[in-house]
Amino acid sequence: CNSDIVIRAKVVGKKLVKEGPFGTMVYTVKQMKMYRGFTKMPHVQYIHTEASESLCGLKLEVNKYQYLLTGRVYDGKVYTGLCNFVERWDQLTLSQRKGLNYRYHLGCNCKIKSCYYLPCFVTSKNECLWTDMLSNFGYPGYQSKHYACIR
């Protein structure tokens, strides 16, 4: 819900571009499917990220995997980084894959309430309690792999 673009894509090339003080890695992608962003950019060909992982830049494998990529659009370019949800497609659970097609868009009005210690509870109808923090110190816990907040 917070991303401008959500796509399934295979990285087919990469190039280091000298934009900004540290450089930008530009990945060429073959878009397999778009889940979000039809109006902002109906077809994504390039994904931009910081060249350095220390600046939240992503390192993606070329011609090896398909990825679920999320990001923002600025000045007609798609940007992503370590703070965005990026995962190899084959590492997603069946629930996550189904969520992309059928469920996640129904939860954009939900508020996730993180539970760090017990007891914890929701305080309004549009809240979903996220308890992954109790056992797995956050992502990726069972809830993040198998649940969706829908209101």
Swiss-Prot record:
GO cellular component entries: extracellular matrix; extracellular space
Chain's gene name: TIMP3
Keyword Membrane in annotation: no
Cystine residue pairs: C1-C108, C115-C120, C128-C149
Homology family: Belongs to the protease inhibitor I35 (TIMP) family.
Keywords: Disulfide bond, Extracellular matrix, Metalloenzyme inhibitor, Metalloprotease inhibitor, Protease inhibitor, Secreted
InterPro entries: Netrin_domain (IPR001134), TIMP (IPR001820), TIMP-like_OB-fold (IPR008993), TIMP_C (IPR027465)
Marked site: Involved in metalloproteinase-binding: N2
Region (Mediates interaction with EFEMP1): 71-151
Region annotation (Involved in metalloproteinase-binding) ranges: 53-54
Its biological purpose: Complexes with metalloproteinases (such as collagenases) and irreversibly inactivates them by binding to their catalytic zinc cofactor. May form part of a tissue-specific acute response to remodeling stimuli.
Superkingdom, taxonomy of origin: Eukaryota
GO-annotated biological processes: negative regulation of membrane protein ectodomain proteolysis; response to cytokine; response to hormone
Pfam families xrefs: TIMP
UniProt entry tagged with the keyword Secreted: yes
PANTHER family: METALLOPROTEASE INHIBITOR, METALLOPROTEINASE INHIBITOR 3
Compartments, record wording: Secreted, Extracellular space, Extracellular matrix
Protein's recorded name: Metalloproteinase inhibitor 3
Complex formation: Interacts with EFEMP1.
